[in-house]
Amino acid sequence: MENFIFHTELKSELNFLIENSHKLDGVLCFHGLAGCGKTTFAKYYSHLVSKEVHLYDASSHLFDKGSASNILKQINETGRSLSEFTDGGKYNADAFWNHCFIIDEWSNLSASRQNAYKVTLERVSKEMNALFILIINTSKECKIDKVLTSAILSRCQTVDFDIKAEHIDEVTELVKERYSMLDEEYIRKTLPDMRQIAKRAKLLS
């Protein structure tokens, strides 16, 4: 967790999820602006709490070849189909969850495709002891209830990764400590896009 630059409130929430992953119902949704660390943390978290991690990208060609229901059939066929999607195989043998399915760019799915998952998310989670992490981009103009259908939203425990106005000062100081080559004006102008900040720091290092 020390490798992430998150404000105290978010870090506390994420630590709680790490310590209590066994209490989750089976579907998490990480949301916020692009570049704020949702996908990177999802990968880190999934390796901690599950035996196998499987990463999907809803914007890739894999999701264009068939309907959402066909993709879910592939998820069900873990032994035969998931090997081509897994990001490296088995991890934590002592983890509570047998599988973690990360679906990045979930917000690219239409409402009808999202709703095709609503029953299967629950069923697969129970039958396979699987955790799903849905990752979506949200903003002030496009909030989570505008991105997720009500059926999917009601099945998710949501985590907001956004850096709000009250967090800017704290996060700015954390970034300055991590990337001393960056000036404060640039940091404040670029937040909350931590991806761009990291790229700039790498360029100047």
Label each PLM-derived region with a short phrase.
Residues F16, E52-S205:
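Non-catalytic interfacial helical region
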Residues F4-T8, G35, I187-M194:
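Conserved phosphate/pyrophosphate-binding and hydrolysis machinery centered on Walker-type P-loop NTPases
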Residues E9, G37-T40, S112:
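Generic alpha-helix structural propensity
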Residues F4, L14, F30, T39-A42, ...:
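Conserved RecA-like P-loop NTPase ATPase core
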Residues E19, D25-S60:
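Walker A/P-loop
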Residues M1-L33, Q74-E77:
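Pre-Walker A (pre-P-loop) alpha-helix and adjacent loop at the N terminus of AAA/AAA+ ATPase modules
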